[in-house]
Amino acid sequence: MNTLDSLQLTDNTILIFTSDNGPVIDDGYQDHAYELLNGHTPMGIYRGGKYSAYEAGTRIPFIVRWPAKVKPSKQQSLFSQIDVYASLASLLNQPLRKGAAPDSQ
């Protein structure tokens, strides 16, 4: 972000920070996942993990930085990453090919 700022590209650049949902600790593999945690709690204060409907399995970060268009705020609304594809295409006035991103709106 500092480089974008120094090159004066910040206002015309969309930065999106996001992640996949939920940690996987016990998925049946012999990968020493529990031992490698070493006290780290990847699900934080939440219950569950990947493959669960609990909050640690469904919460994701989604941070957008685009100073020219997006005012800093915090939303508690439900969000699906599936919609990013069509949303970015629309934002950039790019048509989607027929059958592309059928679940994205």
Where are each of the predicted segments found?
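Substrate-binding rim/cap in mid-to-C-terminal beta-strand-loop elements of soluble/periplasmic
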Residues: M1-S6, E35-Q105
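Metal-dependent active-site segment of extracytoplasmic phospho-/sulfohydrolases and closely related
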Residues: M1-Y29
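Short glycine/serine-rich loop/turn segments
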Residues: V24-H40
